[in-house]
């Protein structure tokens, strides 16, 4: 996953600077993810393909839905292209990790947007790069997604 980390750090910085996620890097996440997950499957004998695909769908549906419903104004196509790759990787770990990662990214992005509005650095309609928040949520999902998901489900008796 070192290759994925290098790509994601690059995308994070580029999106902050230019408010876009370039296709050559975004699309590269797919073969990197698939190869990395295949290596993991071969090494462990664990092939949670259904969970990985569900993770990809969990990430794609809300982000793609916002892009479609807003005519591309509420979310960039780079975010739409990146999301399923991130969800695929987190879904391989577990659906809970995919959900935690996505929700974390949304929450952090929302809090930052509100703070920017409160301090006058943004207003309604201001373009705020969302890729860094997706990548941050992905990192949270990778590191603590399973633990946070289990704790949340346990708190509600599931």
Language-model features and meaning:
Residues 5-6, 68-69, 118-120:
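Short hydrophobic "helix-edge" motifs at membrane interfaces and signal-peptide entry regions
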Residues 10-11, 18-110, 150-158:
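Functional transmembrane core segments of multi-pass inner-membrane proteins
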Residues 15, 109, 129-131:
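Residue-level detector of functionally special positions within alpha-helical transmembrane segments
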Residues 88-92, 104, 113-120, 138-142:
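Short basic/hydrophobic patches in alpha-helices and adjacent helix-turn junctions
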Residues 115-140, 152:
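Interfacial loop-to-transmembrane junctions
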Residues 1-16:
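Membrane-embedded alpha-helical bundles of polytopic integral membrane proteins
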Residues 29, 61, 136-143:
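Hydrophobic cores of alpha-helical transmembrane segments in multi-pass inner/ER membrane proteins
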């Amino acid at each position: 996953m070192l290759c994925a980390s290098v790509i994601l750090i690059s995308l994070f910085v580029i999106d902050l600077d230019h408010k876009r996620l370039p296709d050559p890097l975004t699309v590269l996440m797919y073969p990197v993810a698939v190869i990395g997950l295949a290596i993991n499957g071969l090494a462990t004998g664990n092939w949670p393909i259904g969970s990985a695909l569900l993770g990809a769908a969990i990430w794609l549906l809300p982000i793609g839905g916002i892009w479609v419903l807003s005519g591309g104004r509420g979310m960039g196509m780079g975010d739409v292209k990146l999301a399923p790759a991130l969800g695929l990787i987190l879904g391989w770990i577990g659906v809970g990790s995919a959900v935690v990662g996505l929700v974390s990214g949304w929450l952090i992005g929302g809090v930052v947007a509100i703070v920017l509005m409160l301090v006058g650095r943004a207003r309604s309609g201001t373009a705020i790069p969302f890729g860094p928040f997706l990548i941050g949520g992905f990192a949270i999902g990778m590191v603590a997604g399973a633990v946070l998901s289990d704790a949340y489900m346990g708190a509600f008796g599931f």
